[in-house]
Amino acid sequence: MPSKKALVRRPSPRLAEGLVTHVEREKVDHGLALEQWDAYVEALGAHGWETLEVDPADDCPDSVFVEDAVVVFRNVALITRPGAESRRAETAGVEEAVARLGCSVNWVWEPGTLDGGDVLKIGDTIYVGRGGRTNAAGVQQLRAAFEPLGARVVAVPVSKVLHLKSAVTALPDGTVIGHIPLTDVPSLFPRFLPVPEESGAHVVLLGGSRLLMAASAPKTAELLADLGHEPVLVDIGEFEKLEGCVTCLSVRLRELYD
């Protein structure tokens, strides 16, 4: 039976110092961010996910975006080497967490860089964004780690947003959804559904037809509901100021086994 565990990490007191690349910096309300994070974690739990907190990394402003520190396929965890040097201290606590869960652990080594937010898994196909945070050596090391396990790794150019999953994610049937102005090459995906809002391109598959989505994408939620999906909306506005989205606030572990 597939596992339903999700790694999460409490926001750092220095959250407001987090990196911004493609947006203008806005003031972050730390108290409100904590409330929004709690509600996000509660939403996962309410839909059957066991949330596991990674030890906080208070000196790492971006550490709440825990997805960037690891990529898991089958029972193998690839600890990333983030493209932003200031984020590399985030990986140690995540490595400890996945090791406790029994994952086999591999690492991305210099000169490779890889952010987990650049990795979109659809079945046995792994799309990896080649952009500002993930380089060619990182793509090669991801391929070396997971192709022997049966994965098909497809590199995708990313130039308009921070990460691949800032531009696209996927529905339960494998259809990729994305906001056209931010998607470099939509034709790379076998099935592509345009959505009307930037944050509407980000969904977390909760199980069945349920999709965790940002409250900032009501038009997309309406579109997806009309297609038979069940949007579950959460307000993550303080994290969106830092280019965060619903996917990067957790690491969903669906394929763990004893």
Swiss-Prot record:
List of residues binding substrate: 19, 62, 67-68, 87, 133
Source species, domain of life: Bacteria
Active site feature: 163 (proton donor), 248 (nucleophile)
Q: What class of enzyme is it?
A: hydrolase
Record keywords, A-Z: Hydrolase
Which reaction does this chain catalyze?
N(omega),N(omega)-dimethyl-L-arginine + H2O = dimethylamine + L-citrulline; N(omega)-methyl-L-arginine + H2O = L-citrulline + methylamine
One Gene Ontology BP term is: positive regulation of nitric oxide biosynthetic process
Checking InterPro entries in the record gives: DDAH-like
Q: Does the keyword field hold Hydrolase?
A: yes
EC number(s) for this protein? 3.5.3.18
Keyword Iron-sulfur set for record: no
Gene Ontology molecular function:
amino acid binding; dimethylargininase activity
Kindly give the Gene3D superfamilies that the UniProt entry links to this protein. Answer: L-arginine/glycine Amidinotransferase, Chain A
- What's this protein's family per the entry? Belongs to the DDAH family.
**Entries under PANTHER family matching the protein:** DIMETHYLARGININASE (PTHR12737:SF9), DIMETHYLARGININE DIMETHYLAMINOHYDROLASE (PTHR12737)
Q: What is the documented function of this protein?
A: Hydrolyzes N(G),N(G)-dimethyl-L-arginine (ADMA) and N(G)-monomethyl-L-arginine (MMA).
What is the name of this protein?
N(G),N(G)-dimethylarginine dimethylaminohydrolase
Organism expressing this protein natively: Streptomyces coelicolor (strain ATCC BAA-471 / A3(2) / M145)
In the UniProt record, what gene is named as encoding this protein? ddaH
